[in-house]
Amino acid sequence: MQNQTRIVIENVMPQLDCGSNPIKRIVNQKVNVTAAVFSDGHDVIECCVKFKHENDKKWQEVRMKPSVNDEWSAAFKVEKQGFYTYFVEGWVDYALNWQHGTERKIQDNQYVKSELLEGAEYVKSVMELATDSEREYLEKAAAHFTNESEYDQAIQLAVSAELHQI
């Protein structure tokens, strides 16, 4: 199917008259944004609020955090007077889906070598966005994932909280 969207974003708040009128805030006040964000299935999803002042060229981004059910929330600060534009963006996080699926297989004592090779590809794809210390960790993880003699270390890295955070 063409143009198939897997992420649904509804009930973005605050808004007035379905977004036809601007909300009001003063300088240094926070805009608390909530939205219902969900997907068709059990994939791990992530979302963010993108915002910018009317005179800015670049969008700023704040990651949203899940609260109850399918509701997500985040806040950004009004830093200068004027009009701000914001929207919520959501996506399926394939790397986190890989990590959660691999973790379940490891807990079930399954051999996950092919999953580790897949993980090495995910790790390599995010290296350019990583900080120097994160890149060092990712390079170590990718090396372990592709070296069968380091399988035990590789599965520990695959399900690590550090990898999850990156």
Residue ranges and their predicted role:
Residues 25-31, 159-166:
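Basic K/R-rich, polyanion-interacting modules in nucleoproteins and related proteins
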Residues 1-40, 103-133:
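Non-catalytic, glycine-rich low-complexity segments
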Residues 22, 30, 55-74:
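Beta-rich interaction modules in large eukaryotic scaffold/regulatory proteins
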Residues 38-42, 79-81:
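Short solvent-exposed strand-capping/beta-turn motif centered on an Asx-Ser/Thr pair
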Residues 63-165:
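Extended acidic/polar, glycine-enriched regions
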Residues 47-49:
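Short beta-strand elements bearing conserved aromatic residues within extracellular beta-rich modules
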Residues 31, 45, 82-84:
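Hydrophobic core residues within well-ordered beta-strands of beta-rich domains
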